[in-house]
Amino acid sequence: MMAAGAALALALWLLMPPVGVGGAGPPPIQDGEFTFLLPAGRKQCFYQSAPANASLETEYQVIGGAGLDVDFTLESPQGVLLVSESRKADGVHTVEPTEAGDYKLCFDNSFSTISEKLVFFELIFDSLQDDEEVEGWAEAVEPEEMLDVKMEDIKESIETMRTRLERSIQMLTLLRAFEARDRNLQEGNLERVNFWSAVNVAVLLLVAVLQVCTLKRFFQDKRPVPT
């Protein structure tokens, strides 16, 4: 009964919405993803706030456009250039530990004068929890009930499951980006194949007509017929 009561209390705590504490700091930074169209000859920058002493992972892919490449730079809140890449199709970079402030991510398509690029990028922060949040749900269980339930094992299992689920979501997002890039590439190839196939058919028809006309001329008797 005590173990059942502990499990019920744990389930109720997990279903309850988080309650803010008076004077608490700003909400934690959330992971994010974004897909945008970068015009030819343009540069576009984004700013992302980051807490201190955390881990920031940046992943990007060019999923559309001729060449599938772009220039990428990443700057710290102090203006220090952390990453600089030229004509890359994708990249993964980790900043650890982070500084408190706004990180600057720039994508540059200035080298292209005609082709626009479809760019996907994702920002992943480490999932750090305050000690109060980690220990908060343990307080929902009476001390005597904790004797029958291995609270540390439960916390460890939940944390492992949450981490794996978050990583699974991130991997699915990247797979969607890969799929979008491959689909755009295949659609572009299909358009080129259809165009040149139509050109070849038109040339074949033209050659066939010319051959028929030429043969008909060979067999035409243009000599005058005596009367």
Swiss-Prot record:
GO process terms (BP): protein transport
Main location: membrane
Origin: domain of life: Eukaryota
Signal peptide stretch: 1-23
Extracellular topological domain residue ranges: 24-194
UniProt motif (COPII vesicle coat-binding) ranges: 218-219
Pfam annotation, one family: EMP24_GP25L
InterPro entries associated with the record: Emp24-like, GOLD_dom, GOLD_dom_sf
GO CC terms of this entry: endoplasmic reticulum membrane; endoplasmic reticulum-Golgi intermediate compartment membrane; Golgi apparatus; plasma membrane
Localization annotation: Cell membrane; Endoplasmic reticulum membrane; Golgi apparatus, cis-Golgi network membrane; Endoplasmic reticulum-Golgi intermediate compartment membrane
Quaternary structure and partners: Homodimer in endoplasmic reticulum, endoplasmic reticulum-Golgi intermediate compartment and cis-Golgi network. Interacts with IL1RL1. Interacts with RNF26; this interaction is important to modulate innate immune signaling through the cGAS-STING pathway.
Family statement: Belongs to the EMP24/GP25L family.
Name of the molecule in the record: Transmembrane emp24 domain-containing protein 1
